[in-house]
Amino acid sequence: MDVKFAFAVNSNNEFQKNHFGDTEKFLIYGIESGKLNLLSEELNVSRNMDETHEHGSRKKGLAIINSLKDMGVNVLVSMQFGRNIKMINEHFIPIIIYSEQTEEVVNTLTHQLHWIVDELESAPENYKLFTIKSGILKTVVKK
């Protein structure tokens, strides 16, 4: 399965406590030989779209979703997600992280890839929300 990640980062390639859609750019990672490799850096051209009317607008959310889907992305990684999280998890696995350092997150994800692939293969939509805190990948377990 082809898995691509979009990391929401600032100009210094660090995660920030901003909503996913408010990030400056996305680092796009793919899996090669069992490791995450940086494929490209993409500016968030929808960053300031439609924000004069409503923060977290549906129009902006859909623009970002469509752009990332066109790139083949299926996992989003950020310190925060906004009100569009329900729309996001219909198309992507969202992962909330607590570290600003991309390398730390890359290392954790590399060791936990099987969980991400399993989620993508078992659910075609309405993915679970994952978190990475202190180097540990977690998800909510439904009873």
Residue ranges and their predicted role:
Residues M1-K59, D70-M71, I96-K143:
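Non-catalytic interface/targeting segments
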Residues I65-S99:
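Mid-chain, well-packed structural core segment of small domains
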Residues K60-I64:
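Amphipathic coiled-coil/heptad-repeat helices and related helical stalk/stem segments
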